[in-house]
């Protein structure tokens, strides 16, 4: 039920919490079916908290390894990262809701690349080139306003607190910029990412 297929785009996104029987067992199977059909397949998964049962973490690590073999791109969100952004009064349901929001943002961010107008519009072929057979990925979303809004937004995007990845060493990058910004704003944002990833964008 968590499988999302975007009509007409030929891509499949699999959102899943790893560690339990359903996600760990089913996710790699669904991903393989999609990839075998030649469909761009993106996995977005969570790792359980370290305080959960050791077997659950071991299952999650094994499941992530299997799903990585059967998706083009994989985004991993460790639940432990929630401990860095919530206070002691945050309840477990509230914390898990934040993790789910990041999962949703990851999927939404990719579809928005194609569907929403931007300074330079992308099509599915652009996304496919960057995401096909690429392995672990980093994705982030930022939003800001004011004089340095573009730079502030991209700084938010590359430093997502709930991901264990960074863009350092990235071989491919897509930057999607939208809003009322100037050419210089867009250049500042792209230059910032280029310096961090040390690649040509």
Locate each region found by the language model.
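N-terminal glycine-/lysine-enriched basic segments
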Residues: 11-14, 33-122, 126-131
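Single conserved hydrophobic/aromatic residue that forms the stacking wall/gate
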Residues: 2-13, 199-200
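Short glycine-rich or small-residue beta-strand-to-loop segments that form or flank ligand, phosphate
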Residues: 11-19, 45-47, 138-140, 173-178
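Short glycine/serine/threonine-rich phosphate/pyrophosphate-binding segments
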Residues: 19-30, 52
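Glycine-rich phosphate/diphosphate-binding loops and the adjacent beta-loop-alpha structural elements
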Residues: 81-198
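Short, solvent-exposed amphipathic alpha-helical segments in soluble enzyme
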Residues: 29-33, 60, 190-194
